Structures are given as structure tokens and as C-alpha cells.
Amino acid sequence: MDNMMITLPLLILFLPLVSFIILIFFGKKLPRQGDWVAVGSIVATFFFALYLFIQMILEYDPGVSHGASFSWIDLDAFKIDLGILVDNVTVVMLLIVTLVSSCTHIFSLKYMEGDIRYSRYFAYLGLFTFSMNGIVLADNLISMYMSWELVGVSSYLLIGHWFEKDSAADASKKAFLTNRVGDIGFFIGIMLLYSAVGSFAFGPIFDSIATGNTITGMTLTLAGLGIFLGAAAKSSQFPLHIWLPDAMEGPTPVSALMHAATMVAAGVYMSVRLFPIFTPDALLVIAYIGGITAILASLIAITQNDIKKVLAYSTVSQLGYMILAVGTGVYTAAFFHLLTHAMFKANLFYCSGSVIH
């Protein structure tokens, strides 16, 4: 059973990457430009995630976790491991990501039919799903950061899918650059934690914070705020919320997958996963940012007359509620709302796509 709890997450992680590689190199030579490769691999990951979820329900243990890692860089004074962590939070999030991604792939079969870059579109969806699963499964900050950057790259490619339109090209660049601002803070936060603890892995960092031996006070607050800056950019929080409404220039299924259910939820997921690093001062800032975003975005939404922009600002507002919950210490409520919001907002985007199409 332990082997299954490692093997299936690895398949969930790498099957979309295999799909991406096949479609990039051979997509146009395959029947139907290889859309069946993309859909088949993603639907398979959903059933794997569903199996893990059922096992979690049947053998419920709040403290259970499984992991595997290997040494990537091993120098005398510097070591980086890459690995995965599978616990209850991971399994639930994997189920949501693979379910929404599967629905998006199936919806796209007709929505994107006849598109001039049909196979490339499905390839990029696979790359994004691989990247998002990498964030969910990461057991250390470096693994998470690498997947975090890949999510940024794949969002740039998908938002700018119709790059012949100036508005789509500009929106993809705006999203990419705005997220890089947050990623700088994320990287600084990671380095502050590593310089104090000497490890990128979640376990040693959390243990060090709990004992108060190596990192406390201002350093921990700054590290937490730096990491939250990355979450704020990815989850479109004030003042880095400006990219999400413009990102609606991408195909509507992309909006459902990335800008309603998964990519924008990555910042909330990271905040929940790394909650122990946030000091009371950092949590106060997080709560204020979330509250401002929730109110501001909802007020902007009522002034919009474009169906996708209304949904975009609604998404920003709902993400603000999640971040506010994290800031007030109720991270379980934030995670619950992340799951419910992913489902209903993705469906709203599918409905808007049907109206537009």
C-alpha cells in the first residue's frame, strides 16, 4: 500500500508531462492532432487521484503522510533534494486539479475544434497540469518554486494562445511580468529561511520554527511576507490583482482551469501548506490584504459588462476571502472555500464559454 501511495502520485505528476512532450514533437502527425493523448493522460490521472481519495476516506488518519525524494545537488556545504509529499491535503488538492483539468480537456475538444494551433494548445494544457501537480506534491521549497515558475510559463503560453491579437499578446506579458514581481519576494523568502535553517524541506523548517532555535522574530516575519508576496501575485491579491481580468483574453477553457480553479488557487494552497512560517505580524498583513482585495474586487465587478471580466473580478474577490481566512488563522476554512470555489467558478466559466461560442 505504501508503494501505491508513492507510485500513483508520481504517475499523476508525470503523465501530463509525457503528454506535453508527445504533442509538442509529434502532435500534428497523430490522428486528430493527438487530442486523445492529452485527454487520455489527464483522465487517467483523475482516476488515480480518485483512488487515492477513496483510500484516504477508508483509512482516515489525520497524521498520515508518505514521501520520496532524491538528491539533485549535493555539495559539501549545499544540498538540494527534490521529492514529493503525499498527505490528506495533497490528495484532496490533486483530486480537484485533475478533475477540473479533465473537464477542461474534454470541453476543449469542441470549443477549440479547428484552431490553427490545436495540438499545441493541448500540449500547453498538459504542461500546466504537470506544473500545478508539482506545486501540490512538493515536499520542499525548491521543488515548489520550480513548479511555481513552470506554472507562470505555461500561463503565459496559454493566455497568449491567440497571439495574433494584440490584446492577447499584451495580456500574456502583463500576467507574466506581474507574477515575476511576486516570485522575487517568494525567492527572497526561501533564501531567508534557508540561511537560518540550512534546509529547504518543509519538515526541518517547521520543526525549527516550533522550537524557536534558529529563526524567530523579524527574520521569520520578513521570510513569511516574502513568500506571501509570491502567493499574492499568483492569487491576484491587491495590489498585484491587475493581471487576472486581462488574462480573460485567453481561450475560455483556459480561464476555467487556470484563472478560476487551479493557478490562482496555488497561492492560497501555498499559504495553507506553509502556514506555520507566518508570524502574527505577517498574518495581520495577510488579513488586511485579503480583506481589501475581497471588497475592492467585488465593487469593481459590479461595474463590468463583459461576462468573463465579471467572473474574473468575482474570482479575485473570492480569493480575497480565502486569504483573509488564512490571515485570521482559519486556514482550514480557506482550504475548504478553495475547493468549493474551484468547482462552481470553473462551471461558470464553462457556461460563459458556451454563451460566447
Stretch-by-stretch model annotation:
Residues 149:
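Short phosphate-coordinating micro-motif centered on Lys-Gly-acidic
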Residues 103-144, 153-357:
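Hydrophobic transmembrane alpha-helices and their helix-loop junctions in integral membrane proteins
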Residues 7, 11-14, 18, 22, ...:
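Residue-level signal for short hydrophobic patches within transmembrane helices
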Residues 13-27, 102-103, 232, 294:
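N-terminal signal-anchor/start-transfer transmembrane helix
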